[in-house]
Amino acid sequence: MSLLTIAQSILKETKSGSVPTSIIGNTEDVAKQILEVMTVSITELARSFNWQELQKENSFSTVIAQTGYNLPTDFDRFVNNTFFNTTTQHAVMPVTPEEWRVLNNQGITGGTGFSYSRIRAGQVILLPTPAAVEAHIYEYISNLVVLSSSLVGQSTWLADTDVPAIDAHIVRLDATWRWLKNQGRPYGEDQKIANNAAIERVRANGERRTIKHYYYDANIKIGYPQTITP
């Protein structure tokens, strides 16, 4: 479904009277209002979940004595626990600005086996200062939440033929309750349906781990029995 067909479907379902034949560039109030709703919807959905459709990888090699490395132009946020130094096979641990200052003041240098990172001014900053050329990789969520008709990523709607990068049905459900709210109409039940559908889609649309009875994770404070006796 495209921007135009989603918008028209919402307007027809909610019996909103006028159903425009175009959205982008249309000066009618209904077209401008539904475009605003669609923009808010795709933005909020993209920020609320780590959609697999928006997940990407970025890799780079350090430069000796250089601490900062530019983030991808479409970077929105890190996928947690995916930043690794693939040369040393060690994780790069994210820290808060306060923790960063403490570590920096301690004068940490290479050789400890530990490395830290933070995001600042469009760059990922590493500590300690790299003393060698080493490969790094991390996963991130892209801000290109819309695709053109030729499947080129965009950060917003630019044409009636654009399609959402994430599940179009979820976008339609989410935009429906937002449209009803915009019009001052009851929307609670539609919002509940949309939220539940989004959560279920995220669960179903990505890989999930099978829980095994012998699995152990020190961070999880429960035990798994090795055998089960009926």
Model-derived features with residue positions:
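Glycine-enriched, solvent-exposed interface loops adjoining structured elements
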Residues: M1-P230
